[in-house]
């Protein structure tokens, strides 16, 4: 909730009239972002510094607030790190989900929006991919996302009166809120290109390096589907509204959040530079 994607989701939810409760252990985020969310929206939210694996803490929060729905964003997310420390990723990402689902059941909270990833598709044979494509994650991070998707599908099938879920498969979030008050500012080494671009732009880095020049693309650099983080945030609002609609039957529905169009890293850097310095 206090991270890059979560803070933008908070803005969208508050502006839509939702009361927001954020649970974040701040391992790779800052409570300052939530102060800025309140500054942007003119509204306050409830914040608890806690880990989603702490069942007692979650029970206390659910007992304090009348929770109607959960957006689950918590988890480790670096592909390379997941390959180096797979057990840490399986323990953290799966355990947090198990505890959260148990507490939701205890307090009869039915609606669940899950922050999944396009990594569940592995290396698809063709592009763009749609939600009917086979899933085949190729790294521990992606496998944790796929496992959680399958767990949710099993739970909805077994107890449709107790759980409905939307699985949002992100492609590559980029950008920031138009105010400039919140954006992607990782405390650790960035996991993607865009923080390097912005850090170079403001002088944190002397130069920008784009790795890879032999891909089968127009300019030889990798191609990715970038989606603006505010569009991604609005996707969560739409998922929540859809789940809370009285017309919605119990479900476990996967939805891709992307543009369906790839852009090479070199072209992406060029566009970013033009927008910042034109």
Q: In which residue ranges do the predicted regions lie?
A:
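C-terminal substrate-binding subdomain of Rossmann-fold SDR/epimerase-dehydratase oxidoreductases
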Residues: 193-274
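Short capping/connector residues at structural and topological boundaries
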Residues: 39, 84, 125-126, 134, ...
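N-terminal Rossmann-like NAD(P)+-binding domain of SDR-like oxidoreductases, especially those catalyzing
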Residues: 1-176
């Amino acid at each position: 909730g206090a991270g890059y994607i979560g803070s933008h989701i908070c803005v969208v939810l508050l502006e839509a009239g939702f009361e927001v409760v954020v649970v974040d252990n701040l391992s790779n985020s800052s409570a300052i972002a939530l102060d800025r969310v309140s500054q942007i929206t003119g509204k306050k939210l409830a914040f608890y510094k806690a880990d989603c694996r702490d069942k007692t803490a979650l029970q206390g929060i659910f007992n304090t607030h009348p929770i109607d729905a959960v957006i689950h964003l918590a988890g480790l997310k670096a592909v390379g790190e997941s390959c180096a420390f797979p057990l840490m990723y399986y323990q953290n990402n799966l355990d947090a989900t198990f505890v959260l689902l148990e507490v939701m059941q205890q307090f009869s909270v039915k609606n669940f929006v899950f922050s999944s990833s396009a990594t569940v598709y592995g290396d698809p044979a063709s592009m763009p991919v749609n939600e009917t494509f086979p899933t085949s994650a190729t790294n521990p991070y992606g496998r944790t996302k796929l496992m959680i998707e399958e767990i949710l599908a099993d739970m909805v099938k077994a107890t449709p009166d107790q759980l409905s879920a939307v699985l949002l498969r992100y492609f590559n979030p980029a950008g920031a809120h138009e105010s400039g008050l919140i954006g992607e500012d990782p405390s650790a080494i960035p996991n993607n290109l865009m923080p390097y671009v912005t850090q170079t732009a403001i002088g944190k880095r002397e130069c920008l390096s784009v790795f890879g020049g032999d891909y089968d693309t127009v300019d030889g650099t990798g191609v990715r589907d970038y989606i603006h983080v505010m569009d991604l945030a609005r996707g969560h609002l739409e998922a929540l509204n859809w789940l809370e609609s009285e017309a919605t039957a119990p479900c476990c529905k996967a939805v891709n959040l992307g543009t369906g169009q790839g852009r090479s890293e070199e072209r992406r850097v060029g566009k970013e530079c033009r927008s910042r310095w034109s």
